[in-house]
Every structure is written in C-alpha cells, then in structure tokens.
C-alpha cells in the first residue's frame, strides 16, 4: 500500500508540475512571440529556426509578401495613455487593410505587415496618414513612420526592417 501511495503521489506531483509549466508557458507566450518577431526582423534566425519557432509559438505568418513599418511617437510624451491611444489608432486603421503583427522594439513600434499583394501598400499609406491626422487632432500627439521595401520571403525581412528604421531617421 505504501508503494502504491508513493507512486500515486509522484504521479500527482508530476501532473501538477506539468500544469504549472503549461500555465507559465501560456503567460510568457506573448513575450516569447515578441522576441521571435524581433529575431525574425533582425535576421538572427535560420530558415529552420523560423519554421520551428512559428510552430512552437503559434505565430502565423502566412502571406504572399511582407513589409516592415516602424513607428515612433515624435512628441516627447511621457503620457502612457496617449502613446497607447496612438498605437491603438494605428492598429485599428491597419486592421482594415491587412493582417499584421505589432511589437515593441526599443522606443518604436514595429509592424510586420502580412500582405496578399504589393498593391495593398497604397492603402497602408493612406491608413497611416489617416491615423496620423486622427492622432494629431484627438490626442495632440504626432508620430512618424518608416516603411521598408516589400519582400516575398521571411528571410528578406531584415532588409525591409533596416529600410524602415533608416526611413524613420530622415
């Protein structure tokens, strides 16, 4: 009986540990996904690592082509609510055009656009302009965007990212 009791206790402890690890993993998943996207645009992953991480982290990047947009709030605003509001305005405008993944990188917000066709960029630019006008009018906060080139493969994202970051500096 003691042996069975120990085995049951061990089994219960293992199950509780698995549940605890699963809970920790789920809580840290958004951060892990963000780190993956940063590595992706910076070019620090092999194609095999890209595939494995997409699967492991449940990040869908299905698209015919991609483009990176970098955004920085130009006002020296410590008002977190205003910054959040600006980001939400941009998100809402972009959602009307195409799917995307947004993540923070240093003091910028990076948008990885998942495009069905390069022609969507015209609508993207219009959406960003409209979000800029809304932000200035309602939030009194301006932002700047840099847009990288369109690429067809995930491996080409670092070039688009570099261009978007450089464009933001002008």
Predicted segments, located by residue:
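Flexible, glycine/charge-rich interdomain/linker segments that couple
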Residues: 141-143, 147-154, 170
């Amino acid at each position: 009986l003691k042996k069975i009791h120990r085995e049951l206790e061990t089994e219960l402890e293992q199950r509780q540990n698995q549940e605890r690890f699963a809970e920790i993993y789920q809580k840290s998943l958004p951060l892990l996904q963000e780190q993956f996207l940063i590595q992706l645009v910076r070019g620090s992953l092999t194609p095999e690592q890209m595939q494995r991480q997409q699967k492991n982290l449940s990040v869908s990047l299905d698209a015919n082509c991609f483009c990176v947009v970098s955004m920085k709030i130009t006002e020296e605003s410590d008002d977190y609510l205003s910054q959040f509001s600006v980001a939400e305005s941009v998100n809402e405008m972009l959602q009307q055009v195409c799917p995307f993944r947004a993540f923070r990188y240093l003091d910028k917000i990076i948008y990885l656009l998942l495009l069905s066709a390069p022609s969507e960029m015209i609508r993207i630019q219009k959406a960003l302009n409209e979000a800029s006008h809304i932000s200035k009018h309602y939030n009194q906060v301006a932002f700047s965007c840099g847009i990288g080139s369109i690429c067809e493969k995930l491996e080409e994202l670092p070039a688009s990212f570099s261009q978007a970051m450089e464009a933001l500096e002008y």
